[in-house]
Amino acid sequence: MSSCVVTTSCFYTISDSSIRLKSPKLLNLSNQQRRRSLRSRGGLKVEAYYGLKTPPYPLDALEPYMSRRTLEVHWGKHHRGYVDNLNKQLGKDDRLYGYTMEELIKATYNNGNPLPEFNNAAQVYNHDFFWESMQPGGGDTPQKGVLEQIDKDFGSFTNFREKFTNAALTQFGSGWVWLVLKREERRLEVVKTSNAINPLVWDDIPIICVDVWEHSYYLDYKNDRAKYINTFLNHLVSWNAAMSRMARAEAFVNLGEPNIPIA
């Protein structure tokens, strides 16, 4: 008999339903100890894998600004592909079992010398964060708290929009644009990242992001990235998610907690 135990971003399949693992803390163990901890629990075989999260709305909920067809291809094929490929990689090497997604990304970034698992792990996280950075009826201006912080750090919401848009349009090739909270400076900043890289690797706290890989907008906007970004800011971005993330980010920064909060 087998059971499935769910932890943050990770699922564990265990060959005995009487055994339950909850948020295993294996990071302080050596690789050899971690393998022994996972594989030698009374002869049980433990397998870890990451699941494909569903966007927090129906696939047609963002229409007409982002079509159901885009979600079917982007989430259903591209995003699923990153999850599947990551699981295949982890299945070949159990040294990374037990990591949360955030821990996995930081570990596999390897101080700028990425391990093979990094790209797929980061893309799984990036896409989860992107879907949760949008909502039906989104756009417009942020709520008071977020707006005040944007005004403080960028001078005005208009200045923020211009900087965010410019970052998206000048990101050459594939990548992402993020609004992040810088931990040390305790201020908001717009950053752009190439390919799969995300702000977690620099210990920044992401607040919102937009995907500027071509597959994220080509079905709806062809090669008109400017129209896609303008639509994202006017009709799609979830300032509700941003407000929630900001509140948690500020709490983590003020309390000095080591973990990065996500939506």
Curated annotation (Swiss-Prot):
Q: Tell me what reaction this enzyme catalyses.
A: 2 superoxide + 2 H(+) = H2O2 + O2
- Gene name linked to the record: FSD3
Indicate the family of this protein. Belongs to the iron/manganese superoxide dismutase family.
Q: What protein name does the entry list? A: Superoxide dismutase [Fe] 3, chloroplastic
Which InterPro entries does UniProt cross-reference here? Mn/Fe_SOD (IPR001189), Mn/Fe_SOD_BS (IPR019833), Mn/Fe_SOD_C (IPR019832), Mn/Fe_SOD_N (IPR019831), Mn/Fe_SOD_N_sf (IPR036324), SOD_C_sf (IPR036314)
- Where it mainly occurs, coarsely classed, is plastid
Q: How is the cofactor bound, as the UniProt entry phrases it?
A: Binds 1 Fe cation per subunit.
Q: Which organism is it from?
A: Arabidopsis thaliana (Mouse-ear cress)
Q: What class of enzyme is it?
A: oxidoreductase
Null mutant phenotype reads:
Pale green phenotype. Abnormal plastids, highly vacuolated and without internal membrane structures like thylakoids.
Signal sequence, start to end: none
Tell me where in or outside the cell this protein is found: Plastid, Chloroplast thylakoid
Instruction: Report quaternary structure and partners.
Output: Homodimer. Heterodimer with FSD2. Interacts with MRL7.
